[in-house]
């Protein structure tokens, strides 16, 4: 994304939401800091997070723990997700910045991961959605979290769908 100052307010946001949204996505450092705080808030009170009843913005949220591709250390991040059958689908948007989120790169290197839904923890193996799956899933993903559609318009980088 060349210039975040030129972002236009989406029709589905009011002015107050837009001001908050634009400020909270204004830098990668702020996004990363917020993610760390969100992990702590999730761990302190996980009930309802997976349903979006106890999460920022009311979106279904999980905790994803990956193995760092460089460090080999466990890294945990919150992720909005969508259920698709038995699968949990997440999107590597990083608020429309031109780089992939670290968790995408980590999963590309080490697909085995851990997922926490509310109090429940699971072992999982990540995979990329095929182009056909991504195309079929995208409208439902954007319905789940409209910002993904907005962010995708801000960059030429195709978002990872896992």
What would you call each of these model-derived segments?
Residues 54-57, 152-156:
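Short coil/turn segments at secondary-structure boundaries
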Residues 49-55, 66-69, 100-102, 138:
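Intrinsically disordered, low-complexity segments enriched in polar/charged residues with Gly/Pro
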Residues 50, 71, 148-152:
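Short helix-to-loop capping/linker segments positioned immediately adjacent to catalytic or ligand/cofactor-binding
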Residues 33-49, 73, 77-83, 116-121:
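Short low-complexity stretches enriched in small and charged residues
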Residues 4, 8-27, 94-148, 154-157:
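Short, structured beta-strand-loop surface elements
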Residues 58-95:
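Short beta-strand segments
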Residues 162:
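Catalytic adenosine-cofactor/nucleotide-binding cores of aminoacyl-tRNA synthetases and other
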Residues 1-54:
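Extreme N-terminal tail/first-helix region
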